[in-house]
A protein has these predicted regions:
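Conserved N-terminal entry element of GNAT/NAT acetyltransferase domains
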Residues: 1-23, 140-160
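Ligand-binding pocket scaffold of soluble enzyme catalytic domains
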Residues: 18-21, 26, 31, 56, ...
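Helix-loop element at the rim of GNAT/NAT acetyltransferase active sites that forms part
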Residues: 23-24, 31-43, 169-179
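Short loop/turn motifs at secondary-structure junctions and domain boundaries
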Residues: 45-51
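Conserved beta-strand in the GNAT
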Residues: 56, 62-71, 78-84
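Conserved GNAT acetyl-CoA-binding A-motif
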Residues: 78, 105-117
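Conserved acetyl-CoA-binding loop-helix of GNAT-fold acetyltransferases
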Residues: 85, 91-104, 121-125
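Amide-forming acyltransferase catalytic core, primarily the GNAT-like/NAT-type
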Residues: 128-181
Length: 181
């Protein structure tokens, strides 16, 4: 990581240009996330842009071909996320190029990320080490079966006054405070 990351890169037959994540069209960013099967809504992506920093790769006609973000948690810790490459251009160096920009921004910080199976080789090549396995489950919430006879603890909507307790619970589980989120 001694040499600075370049501002453009030839990928396949496309010349890519780096830009800030804030400059990216939200609908193009959403389309990029959908192209890899991520269940993010446009409003989720906007929230991530407001909380984090990062980069996108654009081709000469302005199409987004990749993204990478980082999220500061205090002065010495950050998480990395939203590392996406267009399926057509995966394995051509776009993600690594964007990660070089992110890692340059994060110098001196402890970093954490969740890697998909497809991205593990990239992160390993950047000297990240596996720590634990995380399983992500997705589904549709359905009403509870009224015929269930098992006692269930009461469930209620989280309110504003619950935020401090939730942030403390999250900090204990995650290992660092994310109260700003």
């Amino acid at each position: 990581m001694d040499a600075p990351a370049s501002e453009s890169k030839l990928i396949d037959s496309f010349k890519m240009h780096v830009a800030t994540i804030e400059s990216a069209d939200l609908e193009q960013l959403h389309a990029l996330s959908v192209s890899v099967g991520w269940p993010l809504r446009s409003e989720d992506l906007q929230f991530l842009r407001e909380c984090g920093r990062g980069y996108v790769a654009r081709d000469d006609i302005g199409r987004l071909t990749g993204s990478a973000m980082w999220f500061p948690h205090g002065d010495d810790f950050a998480t990395i996320g939203m590392v996406i490459t267009s399926p057509r251009l995966q394995s051509n160096g776009t993600a690594r190029w964007l990660m070089e920009h992110v890692l340059r921004d994060c110098l001196g910080r402890n970093l954490r990320l969740n890697a998909t199976r497809a991205s593990r080789r990239l992160y390993h090549s950047l000297d990240f080490k596996p720590m634990r396995t995380i399983y992500q489950c997705q589904g549709i919430v359905r009403p509870a079966d009224s015929t269930t006879t098992t006692e269930q603890p009461p469930v209620r909507r989280l309110e504003g006054e619950d935020l401090v307790a939730v942030a403390e619970l999250d900090a204990g589980a995650f290992g660092v405070s994310r109260a700003a989120l």
